[in-house]
From Swiss-Prot:
Entry function: GTPase that plays an essential role in the late steps of ribosome biogenesis.
Disulfide bond keyword on record: no
Protein name as catalogued: GTPase Der
Gene that specifies this protein: der
Positions with a binding annotation for GTP 1: 10-17, 57-61, 119-122
UniProt domain KH-like: residue ranges: 352-436
Naturally occurring in which organism (per UniProt): Bacillus cytotoxicus (strain DSM 22905 / CIP 110041 / 391-98 / NVH 391-98)
Cited SUPFAM superfamilies: P-loop containing nucleoside triphosphate hydrolases
Residues in EngA-type G domain copies: 4-167, 176-351
């Protein structure tokens, strides 16, 4: 299930980023007193009383030179579209302003749960001055102080009350769920159409739990699949063209519901920095990953071109060294038939479970081949290992001192596990833990 999404909405300079940073527990947004400061990072993961959620700071939208009220409206519209719950942020020192009323009108029409927060209530005496905010029409205002961290617990308690109830996915464990992520115009939707066109066994378009997304189930050679649409495939007008960062959030929500992530690149244009960022989201998710080079038909090539492009991918995406690469053309459908077998392979690897005795044989053989490292006269000692999870395969290695597990030796162990058990397209996680 995807995490609920909380959006912080409000006119500039009411303290959205300060509250955002308080909730996620680290300073991610740039906080300044200048209204309309833009930020590079406008979403993050939050947690409150075992409720995990994603949170958006709408102050991260850079609209440009648009009129002031248009900016507010566009912020609110994006938040309305993406969020399950909206925190409507106001400023207790300023009282209710015309801009607050403009935001309120938009949010009132949204039919989304809205929790009204009055920020900059820095002392108890100021609480008596928040009653004017009832006039905005969202019930009880929650007085908070982003600077001092006051009142956030009560605010988040109320926010969590409005999270959607957790629903079970309607697909069984044998169904492979995958999504396509990539920058605009790399051919994601064309590739979906090419895949569906090969078999044309579209069971139905089932509305997914991700807002706006449509899950497309289909079957090929007896294997059931579901394409989790990122909802970024469809253009949504001017607001979305100017808020590209929100396509990242939609992609992340699709990734959360997927077993396999296809990172789609443009073979004609080559690799750019944005591709690397997008690929990083796939890697960080712990999902199985396939790198797809689309538009290969448009590339002038000889017998060395594919190898050179693959080497370029490996150089840029060193963190995805485990991901297989598929070259194809969605437009001509050339080589598209090679994709599903690779998806099957990485999905199977993602779910491999290794017997403990066999696992420990491999670990001890690896140690014999390459002795454990030392640090300040102390040598890492590995006692035994066990697998604790799949999707991705996760192993706990019990040692004398976890601090002695150098990242390079951890990488060596991962490579030995990969070679020994045929892990393809899936990250492997190793957790060093002290033996009791």
């Amino acid at each position: 299930m995807p995490k609920p999404v909380v959006a912080i909405v409000g006119r500039p300079n009411v303290g959205k980023s300060t509250i955002f940073n308080r909730i996620v527990g680290e300073r991610i947004s740039i906080v300044e007193d200048i209204p309309g400061v833009t930020r590079d990072r406008i979403y993050s993961a939050g947690e409150w009383l075992n409720h995990e959620f994603n949170i958006i700071d709408t102050g991260g939208i850079d609209i440009g030179d648009e009129p002031f009220l248009t900016q507010i409206r566009q912020q609110a519209e994006v938040a309305i579209d993406e969020a399950d719950v909206i925190i409507f942020m106001t400023n207790g020192r300023d009282g209710v302003t015309a801009a607050d009323e403009e935001v309120a009108k938009i949010l009132y029409r949204s039919n989304k749960p809205v929790v009204l927060a009055v920020n900059k209530v820095d002392n108890p005496e100021m609480r008596n001055e928040i009653y004017d905010f009832y006039a905005l029409g969202f019930g009880e205002p929650f007085p908070i102080s982003g600077t001092h961290g006051l009142g956030l617990g009560d605010l988040l308690d109320e926010v969590a009350q409005h999270f959607p109830k957790v629903e079970e996915e309607e697909y069984d464990d044998e169904t492979i769920r995958f999504c396509l992520i990539g920058r605009p115009n790399v051919g994601k939707s064309s590739l979906v159409n090419a895949l569906l066109g090969q078999e044309r066994v579209i069971v139905s378009n089932v509305a997914g739990t991700t807002r706006d997304a449509v899950d497309t189930p289909y079957t090929k050679d007896g294997q059931d699949y579901v394409i989790i649409d990122t909802a970024g495939m469809r253009k949504k007008g001017k607001v979305y063209e100017s808020t590209e960062k929100y396509s990242v959030l939609r992609a992340l929500r699709a990734i959360e519901r997927s077993d396999v992530v296809l990172v789609v690149l443009d073979g004609e244009e080559g690799i750019i920095e944005q591709d690397k960022k997008i690929a990083g989201y796939a890697h960080d998710s712990g999902r199985a990953v396939v790198i797809v080079v689309n538009k290969w038909d448009a590339v002038k090539k000889d017998e060395k071109t594919m190898k050179a492009f693959e080497d370029n991918i490996r150089a840029h995406f060193q963190f995805l060294d485990y991901a297989p690469i598929v070259f194809l053309s969605a437009k001509t459908k050339k080589r598209t038939q090679t994709l599903l077998p690779v998806i099957n392979q990485v999905s199977e690897s993602h779910n491999i479970r290794v017997q403990t005795n066999v696992l420990n044989d491999v670990i001890m053989d690896a140690v014999a081949m390459n002795p454990t490292p030392t640090h300040n006269g102390s040598r890492l000692k590995i006692f035994y290992a066990t697998q604790v999870a799949v999707k991705p395969p996760t192993f706990v290695v019990f040692v004398n001192d976890p601090e002695l597990m150098h990242f390079s030796y951890e990488r060596f162990l991962k490579n030995r596990l990969r070679e020994s058990f045929g892990f393809v397209g899936t990250p492997i996680r190793i957790i060093a833990r002290a033996r009791d």
